[in-house]
Amino acid sequence: ALAMLLSVTAFATETAASWSVFGGNADHNAVVGKAPTTDVTVTALKLLKPDSGWDGVDTVPLMQTVGNVTYAYVLYDGHADGCTLAKINCSANTPYVVWHKQLESKSGFQLSTPLLVQGSNDNSEADDVIYAASNSGAVYKITGLQASDTDATGVEATKIYTVSKGQINTPIVSYGDYIYFGTWVGNGTIEGSTEPGRYYQVQVANVPSTSNDSYPVQSVSSIYKGFYWGGAVAVGEKVYFCGDGGYLYYRPMGDGFGTTADTDIYATSISLPSVDGNAAGDVRSTIMTKDGKLYFASKGSSIGNVYCYTIGSNGVPAFSWGAKLSCTIGNDTYSGNCTSTPVIADSGNIYVGFYSGFSAGGLMKITAPTSGTLGTASLITVEGAAFTQPVQCTPVVYTDDGMDYFYFNTNSGTGAGYCFAVLPDETDAVEMWKTDNDTYALGGMAICNGYAVFGNDYNHLYIVK
């Protein structure tokens, strides 16, 4: 897309046969145990108002398997049909759209990946809920997902909250009784004349009876502009998220999430350091966590950084190491911005996407330092040649029989979906499959039960199995 890119809860069940949040699970690690590798079948569906535009599918789909059927849900801009949620049957011999549900008539970029909260019945969607945000700043609770007709009869979208200012551009995530999301204001600062974006905690489960049917909300201010694609992660009793200006924030979950004064946020924020002389710039990546550490990437000015922070016993993160997204092969240097969330394969390897405009980029393997604080980046090549397509999404990784497979799509005028395979101790990959060239594909893939799904700006939705 030409505009730049969730979670175990106390009230939801997350299963291996689901991709219910950004990154597939509460840790946002995008690691799956089953994925299409060879002899694939590709189906390209056309959603509402297809074949043109720059603001079609800009989010990552949600997926779940109910009984023996795998479904995908995708939030997208239907142009004249407005902000729309679609349900797709991926398991049919020829995948098809089950229903479309318009949330709002207003058209525009829909950049917030929704959240699927699954109920206790694995054989029905009747007790499942989707939380989705529109580009107008409204958050919807969507029920009746079991509907089976194209007009979505029985699907109800209830507006539960509207932000006062800005766009909701982050994934919606959930921990405990709460959902979390952030807003972005293009020119705001915490002590300036224009207020910046905010991060919100909305209580959607175990709501106290004194709330008069409303959902209790707390929020904190960003220091600079706001939050763009920066999805939150929770570890222990704290919630962590990143924003523009190169800041990492940490707040207590629950009653203490908000601040008395906006400027109190300084006490629980960290200004990210430069890495090898390269300033952080904005952070437009969701945080991934593994083994008590936080991993994320910064966009940078022209070159991004990957960061690793260790969570202390008091929940306060401390800088562990960083890597600048630049490497040299022969006489050629490869580098770029980053909005991709780093992923750690079961092999232990760290992979991340990068881009430079809409015509260059690729994938890098990140190696943590054995001593010191400076990691290294290595370009993933394909059969000895540089792969130089822009990758703004978060790759999905699958490790099988000693091989790392990663799945991603490219945000270029000929954008497509790819599967690469590489030995864990190598950086030269083999292309396993590729969809036909199409158009800008920003949001990344979701993979569930062996099905890979992604969309693009032309409202083309690809199902690979």
Question: Whereabouts are the PLM-identified features?
Answer:
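Extracytoplasmic/lumenal domain signature
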Residues: 13-58, 62-465
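Bacterial N-terminal signal peptides
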Residues: 1-7
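C-terminal juxtamembrane segment of a hydrophobic transmembrane alpha-helix
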Residues: 8-12
